[in-house]
């Protein structure tokens, strides 16, 4: 994960509480795809005690804003097919399902849905 966060073509955002402790983070990898510059959400994680407080939404919206300002036209991510909470979360943010990738999580042999979102032009 550290290699993604430190890459030149990455957006890495960290949410902190008042005392400086980390409450969550998001890492977005930027790359040229068939439709232009794309952002791929490598990971989004929020500490359990800070979930359902808007931390994940703020991280994602800021990552999308920064990506859009850099010329990213589309964001993409994968989510475990059984993670109903995450699926609802991403759909609320405007992501739509674009297929399934079998055994995406190879170690556990689990499938993942591919989600995408078009970003507004800046």
Each model region followed by its residue ranges:
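Beta-hairpin "wing" of winged helix-turn-helix
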Residues: 98-100
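Short coil/turn segments at alpha/beta junctions that flank glycine-rich nucleotide-binding fingerprints
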Residues: 53, 70-73
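Acetyl-CoA-dependent GNAT
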Residues: 1-49, 60-62, 66, 70, ...
């Amino acid at each position: 994960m550290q290699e993604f966060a430190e890459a030149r073509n990455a957006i890495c955002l960290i949410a902190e509480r008042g005392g400086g402790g980390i409450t969550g983070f998001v890492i977005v990898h930027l790359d040229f795809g068939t439709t232009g510059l794309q952002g791929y959400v490598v990971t989004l994680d929020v500490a359990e005690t800070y979930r359902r407080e808007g931390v994940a939404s703020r991280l994602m919206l800021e990552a999308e804003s920064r990506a859009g300002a850099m010329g990213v036209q589309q964001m993409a991510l994968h989510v475990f097919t059984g993670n109903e909470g995450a699926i609802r979360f991403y759909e609320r943010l405007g992501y739509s399902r674009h297929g399934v990738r079998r055994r995406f999580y190879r170690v556990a042999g689990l499938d993942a849905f591919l989600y995408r979102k078009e970003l507004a032009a800046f």
